[in-house]
UniProtKB/Swiss-Prot annotation:
Belongs to the transaldolase family. Type 2 subfamily. This is Transaldolase. InterPro entries: Aldolase_TIM, TAL/FSA, Transaldolase_2, Transaldolase_AS. SUPFAM superfamilies: Aldolase (SSF51569). Its main location: cytoplasm. Pathway: Carbohydrate degradation; pentose phosphate pathway; D-glyceraldehyde 3-phosphate and beta-D-fructose 6-phosphate from D-ribose 5-phosphate and D-xylulose 5-phosphate (non-oxidative stage): step 2/3.
């Protein structure tokens, strides 16, 4: 399919040396991480115990960052051939989620992490809050690729695009001799969360497991219509809880061109060999169906609640790691 990319929403040190290599050989083109993923890896995998003991004299956040950066560097190296050959192959790392309402601290942390990792195929994950749009702009302006995350509303996706695109324009303006300098243009993804909508609104909806798909389709249409190939829609939160849906449901239903889907391992396994293009619905079709399923006020409230909950969950996961270390 034209410009569709499937990423793995998981990272763990030993996994990167084994199963991850198999996934790359079967068409996986990137990976994502978040505080919850690192929490599960660091606290549950024995491979980190010796490393933690060797770092015990350091501050807890420094220990976390050293572990996380090591894994991100390893993933970046595994993905490097895809990055240099196909302009894909990114791995994402999120800034400290507790900084989401502070522009200055978020920007400083993002630049520091990018420098510490020292790999070109890194995307810095920035939550889409009011304080963060300026961060996205500054990073793209300075040639640092961005994963704008925790997007639930059309308004968020539009503001992310505006910030990212403005930074991209400035980057290009400041790098007129781009080819001579051998400088790569930064890329961005706008991560639209999908299944969380359905889990929240299914009890109130007249049709099950459709709101997340329709909402994501709407944001995708907005991003795709801008015709900027360096800024793509990414579908996140595409895992299925329970047995009422196929594990790859949120991959198959959002198989759109020039998009990315980052999925958990069970969804990727279920999806193997099913690359069938899906035609996105047009906006009027989306709104017609959405309005039959649930009210606009319920959708708007859900967007706000899900953003608040997502920020809180990542902050709690981050705090849990630090407490355990």
């Amino acid at each position: 399919m034209k410009n569709f990319s499937l990423w793995c929403d998981f990272i763990e040190n030993s996994f990167l040396d084994n199963e991850f290599l198999n996934l790359l050989s079967h068409g996986i083109n990137g990976a994502t991480s978040n505080p919850a993923i690192f929490k599960n890896a660091i606290l549950n995998s024995p491979i980190y115990k010796d490393k933690i003991l060797k770092l015990k004299e350091k501050k807890t956040k420094d220990i976390y960052e050293e572990l996380a950066i090591s894994d991100i560097q390893k993933a970046a190296d595994k993905l490097a051939p895809l990055f240099y050959q196909k302009n894909d192959g990114f791995i994402s790392i999120e800034i400290d989620p507790r900084l989401h309402d502070n522009t200055t601290l978020s920007l400083g942390e993002a630049k520091r992490l990018y420098s510490a990792i020292g790999k070109e195929n890194i995307m810095i994950k920035i939550p889409a809050t009011k304080a963060s749009y300026e961060v996205m702009y500054e990073l793209m302006k300075n040639g640092i690729s961005v994963n704008a995350t925790l997007i639930f509303s059309l308004e968020q996706s539009q503001k992310c695009f505006e910030a990212l695109n403005a930074g991209l324009v400035e980057f290009r303006k400041n790098n007129i001799a781009l080819k001579e300098q051998n400088t790569r243009t930064p890329q961005a993804v706008i991560s639209i969360f999908v299944s969380r909508f359905d889990r929240l609104l299914n009890p109130k909806a007249k049709e099950q497991n459709r709101i997340g798909i329709l909402n994501a389709n709407l944001a995708y249409n907005n991003i795709y219509s801008k015709n900027e190939p360096n800024i793509r829609a990414l579908f996140a939160s595409t895992g299925v809880k329970g047995d009422d849906l196929p594990k790859d449901y949120y991959i198959k239903e959002l198989l759109f061109e020039n998009s990315v889907n980052t999925a958990p391992l069970d969804a990727i396994e279920a999806f193997k060999g099913k690359m069938h293009f899906k035609k996105p619905l047009m906006n009027f079709e989306i709104y017609t169906e959405l309005n039959q399923i649930i009210s606009q006020s319920e959708r708007e409230k859900a967007c706000n609640d899900l953003l608040s909950d997502g920020l809180e969950q990542f902050c709690i996961a981050f705090e849990d790691i630090l407490k355990a270390l």
